[in-house]
Amino acid sequence: KQLTEVYFKTDPVVYDIYDGIRLLSICRTARDRMQNLAFCYQMTGETRYADRCIEEMKAVCNFKDWNPYHFLDTSEMTEALSFAYDWLYDYLTPDMRETAKTAIIEKGLNQILEDYRDEPSGRRRTWKWAQSPVADNWNLVCNSGLLQGAMAVAEDVPEIAAEVFDGGLELIKKAVLLYGPDGAWYEGPGYWLYATSYYTDLMCCLDSVFSDTFGYLNVPGIAQTGYYITSITGPCGNFNFHDSDIGSVNSPEIFFLADKLHDAALSNLRMEQMADRGTNGTIRDILYYNPGLSGTAATMQKDYYFRDTEVASFRSDWDDSNSIFLGVHAGKTNVYHGHMDAGSFVLDGFGTRYASDLGADNYNIRDSVWNLYRYRAEGHNTLVINPSKDGGQKLAGAARIDRFESGINSGYAIMDLTDMYKDAESVSRGFKLTNNRSAVIVQDEIKTAEPADIWWFMHTTNDIEVAEDGKSATVKGKYKNLKVSLLADTPGTFSVMSASPMETSPQNSEQNKNLMYKKLAFHAENVSEITIPILMQFVIPIEGLEENYSVPCVPLSQWTLDETGASEKPMLTSITVDGAELPGFKSDRYVYAYRIAADSEKMPEVKAEGSGEVSVKYTASVPGYAVITVNDRVDSNVINQYIIKIDKEILKQAPEGVSQLSVKEVKASSVPQPENSPENTLDGDLTTRWSAEGNANIVFDLGESRSVKYLGLAVYQDTTNDGRQQYFDVLVSEDGENYTQVYSGESSGTTLEEEIFPIPETRGRYVKIYCKGTSVGNWNSLTECTLYGN
């Protein structure tokens, strides 16, 4: 209901082929509005929701077409109107029923029949998806939307509906087989969600109308696919290989799969997503949820490998939002939405994504994707051998995971990348989560016929420092830094490079400049045989508290699971803060957040007990940290560390005695969407916002030096109410040039309303909110900002 209130302040959608090809964003806006409004009418009986929904229905029915040229648009709009037509049927006037039914038939069903028949008809399509011998997300989306439309009007046009049923149900046979053998989706997690959302909608409608899903739920991989999407999602987002964007996949489809497959553990997994990971429910969660399946905890493996798509994931824990997550991908390049990303990986740990995948570029750039940085090997966390205009990996190449093993304290995967590199005799890459799942090894073994130029890349949004000797580097993080070092005396050095094409690569001026990214590079010249063994360990950025783990370099052929047990690592048995037990404490959870009263300035007293010698160190002030170190009683070099981030509580309103400060001017570092300007953060309207991608900032000029004590911040949530948390720093300046950081925090992700953050009282004229992305992606969106002080 809270989301639908925005619709009453906006006009219905209008026809707009915004990029010369797609109506898609208009279709999705209409879909969200009509389904949310119709659902609220069904739940409350309040006619204002139905009346506002009808305004959207009239608008889309009056469109000249639903853009069958880009047929995804037609499918999405057909489904959207069909839902509204069905859910409001008894409320609609006879004329409105006729209008909606006619639009579904003429603008939807008749269009897909042209594709099914494939007769010369003068139709124009971006491509003939229905005739493609290889299936992808289009197959499920296009057929599903129109099949739902056919079900909505079948009683009135049975012959047309029957032809759509025959054509659509036949075509999706090859699409559902893509979930095999283990539930993965080769186009990446973003297209898994797109395809699976339409697949589950269709299955739900078939079950509702015919009480039968005609065997489409009984294909290889369907029973595992809910576990697939969960397993490749880390604490900081999904493993967005191929054409996927970073973000946490919000998947109510899991409830549907759990219900139809009678999998109580899978149902509980979705419940845990919403309860523990900040993901709020959607309409489909309500529709798909079966309360009779609750109560069975999901038993998730820490490591997964999915064949054919050739993707694997490893993690230290499932219940800790600061756990370590490693996602790795081999696979093929020449597939729909494919990249030259064999051997690539992402790495999360302690609230930071240290190794990032850049995702797709603008689909409308008129150039081969293999000329664009984000699609080439150099744009991924993998190897490039002898850089040239070629993409860096073979277009027809295929890489596979030859060995995968998972144990209690470690897991690893070894890839054969030889087929991807034309100048190589053999290329193997191994990934290992080691040291009781607290460190990562990435090891490459390369042989070439002739001496070669070898590059190793890792992209990140974080700051990087390289040691003077070039043999190690540090990637900065939220709680811990990532120390990257060589395990052997390997020729070559580390350096920091921009995330941009090398001199030997094509230079397309239209492509994304990737300004929020940089990359750590390792370069070895004139080598024909080399092993590059790299250790990545997470270290606390406080002097004297470094934890150093050493391990010998072992050939990949000799890799085994770690034999040492977790019990050998000293653990805490309790932590108290000011005499009270630390909420959520677990011996194997190493990062905590603790909030004190907003008016308190005193660091709380932290005490702990454990299996070793315990010591506690604090930073000087709040917000800050308490770091607990446990040394083994026998070998003091064996240590374990726990971190408590201590901050002040977030308030719902500013306390008495402070005033709202007036703002003379507001500016932003970038305004990529003119309608989402920085001025929107001062208009008192939670339906408007300022949005910018990546590391962006917004600056408020108070006109004169003022004392600033509190920041009010409201964060945009999308139509799925996705629970996004905004990460930000607060900096203050007297002259607008020299800034001092005074606060670093994150929104709760639980409300659309403004939250009040206590910050250390600071004088200044300019206040900068430095935004660092959200828990679901790289876009920052602030709806309101208010400063309070004296």
Which sequence ranges carry the predicted segments?
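Aromatic, loop-rich ligand-recognition surfaces of beta-strand-rich domains
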Residues: 675, 681-743, 750-790
